[in-house]
UniProtKB/Swiss-Prot annotation:
GO BP annotation list: bacterial-type flagellum assembly; regulation of translation
Protein name (Swiss-Prot/TrEMBL): Flagellar assembly factor FliW
Function statement: Acts as an anti-CsrA protein, binds CsrA and prevents it from repressing translation of its target genes, one of which is flagellin. Binds to flagellin and participates in the assembly of the flagellum.
Similarity comment: family membership: Belongs to the FliW family.
């Protein structure tokens, strides 16, 4: 599948890499097909690119790189909708917000994207657990982020 994106230009995505979301991302419910785009295998930041709208993409990161003890409770309804039979098939991503001041880099730990990596199905869940902040300060807590290394988030073709 080929798609024209505002950040990466024309990209080609294999059908086997398409992740389907029944409800989309909160506020972007019309986008149902996504793909994870890697800038560099060493860079922890990825792009969650909509394949329905080339202008819609989110910077995401594995929450375990930010909080090694991140343990969100996923309810049975979520596991059933995503057809998760094996816990090893679950991948979690959280959306990163980048404001005009890069020092204000935050991650939403309260609403992770839950992915069934085996079946390429996903949904965003809103957790009721207040231990997980909506605006987790990445730079303030960077000692957890791959040993404190800094990485650039750029919109160059993967």
């Amino acid at each position: 599948m080929k798609i024209s994106t505002t950040r990466f230009g024309m990209i080609e995505i294999s059908e086997s890499d398409i992740i389907l979301m029944r409800r989309g991302i909160l506020g972007f419910e019309e986008s149902k097909k996504y793909a994870l785009l890697y800038q560099d295998v060493k860079n922890p930041f990825l792009w969650f690119q909509s394949l329905d709208d080339g202008a819609t993409a989110f910077v995401v990161i594995d929450p375990f790189l930010l909080q090694p003890y991140y343990q969100p409770e996923l309810n049975d309804d979520t596991l059933e909708k995503l057809e998760i039979d094996n816990p090893e098939d679950v991948a979690l991503m959280v959306i990163v917000s980048i404001r005009s001041n890069p020092v204000l880099l935050t991650a939403n730990l309260r609403a992770p994207i839950v992915i069934n990596a085996a079946k390429k199905k996903a949904c965003q869940v809103v957790l009721e657990d207040s231990r997980f902040p909506i605006r987790y300060d990445i730079l303030k807590n960077r000692e957890f982020l791959l040993g404190g290394h800094c990485y650039e988030i750029s919109a160059t073709a993967p």
